[in-house]
């Protein structure tokens, strides 16, 4: 916090000086300034400045130049302070920001819950008999593979639509109101699921509920990354993964209860659907009182509201707090202005592919999130069904699922500790490497039909869940918030999540064919397939995924602009606020009567 203390003191001195000499000019300052382009003046893009020595009163333009350099210097100091801020200091300074971020991310509990109960329903006896068909060979009731695929496609298609609607909605009304609208529709669409009497009604309900889920997927990550400092970014973005796991654990517990008490009652599947009404109302009320993202407000030119929003995320009071707010707004403005100079247009989906820099950032973000599906994690979502098809009893299958989600929660907490010693890329790559090994072992056990091998394959799937939630699962939520530029963050995250959804659809279809007894009936041998796909994902990460740990958004922007290779991101040092030949005090006997000054665009 040394930089921050120095900056606060400097700001106080500057304020004091302005009070001592109100309306007066220093004798060495030039009389007036003529600029080439008035629009560039506001964007820190000063390419030519001329000083005339014939008078001594400073003009308004001269004040603008001073303000520009002060703002750039303040932004640099604020950026350095954020990068060097310890975790304890960040929590003490931004406790409200952390609390608001946790509240918004809690919306993901509902998506994790519902997607988990859908997979568990396929192993629930009452659900199988009411909506399934009987296998002529075994006499067992089962939901057909085509319907399992159809239901999965429905909610994922709904998420894709919801994600695409999220972009224009955020542009229009902001993050908070978009989330509140999504929560309202989720509560309304749940009625369709509760009163379902056919798989067709469930399909419609899943598709409609998928739209607000898509909104939650995008905004929880972007909101957490924009409202919190660098020291808290990893913890609060990866909390999204914890919310998924809490939802899945909640679902596993409810489904185990349904399997025990309501195995032959419609409450076995109606009660899990009804419990989705618990969270929308309290979450909507909490989000209504939450501050809007200051980055969104600055992009809209609403600077006073951005300052009010930042005040609500900071602790303390007095002039120090106001200085921190001003510094943060300056940093956000400088960052956004630098990005805007790359294009004069408002950020759109086409801008994500407009030039080489943005194409690279979009590609990495999309493939990074798609890696959550290609690493075999979709199999974890069908764990209860997998255990049953691997030969484990129905009751033990539900017990295994609960243990699996508990291990996932522990692994995510462990990743918070590991993030102090390992980077984002390290956790992503190590997790993939361990999963690859375990999947091949599961496939090998699937070649045996003994009771021990069946229990072993089920136990190892829990190991996959542990390594997944230690590495790739939590770190992806942080990476996808850091890779895009601030101007295109929401839209890039939407594209990335939709890429994940499309890949997940393909992976889900493959898994259902692999596990269904009427189709390929691979059982645990499917581990071979996912081991190969997981290894391919690891190769991509080694080649293309940069290390962003310890880098602020402005530094990441500069590294991408310079075209630094993925494996050199960590070691490359940049100064995003470099100023070339800044204007100095001008003597009145300047022989030419003019001085040129240049400021680096980026």
UniProtKB/Swiss-Prot annotation:
Belongs to the major facilitator superfamily. Sugar transporter (TC 2.A.1.1) family. It holds the Pfam family Sugar_tr. Residues 1-106, 164-178, 222-234, 292-363, 419-426, 481-492, 547-602 are cytoplasmic. It comes from Saccharomyces cerevisiae (strain AWRI1631). Signal peptide: none annotated. Residues 582-595 have a biased composition (Basic and acidic residues). Residues 580-602 are annotated as: Disordered. GO terms for molecular function: carbohydrate:proton symporter activity. InterPro entries: MFS_dom, MFS_sugar_transport-like, MFS_Sugar_Transporters, MFS_trans_sf, Sugar/inositol_transpt, Sugar_transporter_CS. This is Alpha-glucosides permease MPH3. One of its GO terms (cellular component) is plasma membrane. GO terms for biological process: maltose metabolic process. Induction: By maltose and maltotriose. Repressed by glucose. Keywords: Cell membrane, Maltose metabolism, Membrane, Sugar transport, Transmembrane, Transmembrane helix, Transport. Residues 128-142, 200, 256-270, 385-397, 448-459, 514-525 are extracellular. It is a multi-pass membrane protein. The keyword Mitochondrion does not apply. High-affinity uptake of maltose and maltotriose. Also transports alpha-methylglucoside, glucose and turanose but not melezitose or trehalose. It is found in: Cell membrane. The chain crosses the membrane at residues 107-127, 143-163, 179-199, 201-221, 235-255, 271-291, 364-384, 398-418, 427-447, 460-480, 493-513, 526-546.
């Amino acid at each position: 916090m040394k930089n921050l203390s120095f900056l606060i003191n400097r700001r106080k001195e500057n304020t004091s000086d302005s009070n001592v000499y109100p309306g007066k000019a220093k004798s060495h300052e030039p009389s007036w300034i003529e600029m080439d382009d008035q629009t560039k003046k506001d964007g820190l893009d000063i390419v030519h400045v001329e000083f005339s020595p014939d008078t001594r009163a400073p003009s308004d333009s001269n004040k603008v130049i001073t303000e520009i350099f002060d703002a750039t210097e303040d932004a640099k100091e604020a950026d350095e302070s954020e990068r060097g801020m310890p975790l304890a200091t960040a929590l003490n300074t931004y406790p409200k920001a952390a609390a608001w971020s946790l509240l918004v991310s809690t919306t993901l509990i509902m998506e994790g819950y519902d997607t988990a109960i859908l997979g568990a329903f396929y192993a629930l006896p009452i659900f199988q008999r009411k909506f399934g068909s009987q296998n002529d060979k075994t006499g067992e009731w089962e939901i057909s593979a085509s319907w399992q695929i159809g239901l999965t496609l429905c909610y994922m298609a709904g998420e894709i639509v919801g994600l695409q609607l999220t972009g224009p909605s955020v542009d229009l009304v902001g993050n908070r109101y978009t989330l509140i609208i999504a929560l309202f529709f989720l509560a309304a669409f749940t009625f369709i699921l509760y009163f379902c009497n056919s798989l067709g009604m469930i399909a419609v309900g899943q598709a409609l509920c998928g739209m607000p889920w898509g909104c939650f997927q995008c905004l929880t990550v972007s909101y957490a990354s924009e409202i919190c400092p660098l020291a808290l970014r990893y913890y609060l973005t990866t909390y999204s993964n914890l919310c998924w796991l809490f939802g899945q654990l909640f679902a596993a517990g409810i489904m185990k209860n349904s399997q025990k008490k309501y195995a032959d009652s419609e409450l076995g599947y109606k009660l899990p659907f009804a419990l989705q009404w618990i969270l929308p109302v309290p979450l909507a009320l909490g989000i209504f009182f939450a501050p809007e993202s200051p980055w969104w407000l600055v992009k809209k030119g609403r600077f006073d509201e951005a300052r009010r929003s930042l005040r609500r995320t900071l602790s303390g009071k007095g002039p120090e707090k106001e200085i921190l707010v001003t510094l943060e707004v300056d940093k956000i403005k400088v960052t956004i202005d630098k990005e805007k100079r790359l294009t004069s247009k408002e950020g759109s989906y086409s801008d994500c592919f407009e030039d080489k820099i943005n194409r690279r950032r979009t590609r990495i973000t999309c493939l990074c999130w798609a890696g959550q599906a290609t690493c075999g994690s979709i199999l974890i979502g069908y764990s209860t069904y997998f255990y049953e098809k691997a030969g484990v009893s129905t009751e033990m299958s539900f017990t295994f699922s609960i243990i699996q989600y508990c291990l996932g929660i522990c692994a995510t907490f462990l990743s918070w500790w590991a993030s102090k010693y390992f980077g984002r890329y390290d956790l992503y790559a190590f997790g993939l490497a361990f999963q690859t090994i375990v999947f091949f072992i599961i496939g090998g056990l699937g070649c045996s039909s003994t009771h021990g091998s069946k229990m072993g394959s089920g136990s190892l799937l829990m190991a996959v869940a542990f390594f997944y939630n230690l590495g790739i699962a939590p770190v992806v939520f942080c990476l996808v918030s850091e890779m895009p530029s601030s101007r295109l963050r929401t839209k890039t995250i939407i594209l990335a999540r939709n890429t994940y959804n499309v890949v997940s659809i393909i992976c889900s279809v493959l898994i259902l064919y692999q596990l269904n007894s009427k189709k390929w009936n691979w059982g645990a041998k499917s581990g071979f397939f996912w081991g190969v796909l997981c290894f391919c994902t690891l190769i991509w990460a080694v080649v293309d995924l940069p290390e962003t740990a310890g880098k602020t958004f402005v530094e990441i922007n500069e590294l991408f602009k310079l075209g630094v290779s993925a494996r050199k991101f960590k070691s490359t040092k940049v100064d995003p606020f470099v100023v070339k030949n800044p204007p100095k005090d001008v003597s009145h006997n300047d022989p030419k009567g003019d001085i040129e000054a240049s400021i680096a665009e980026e």
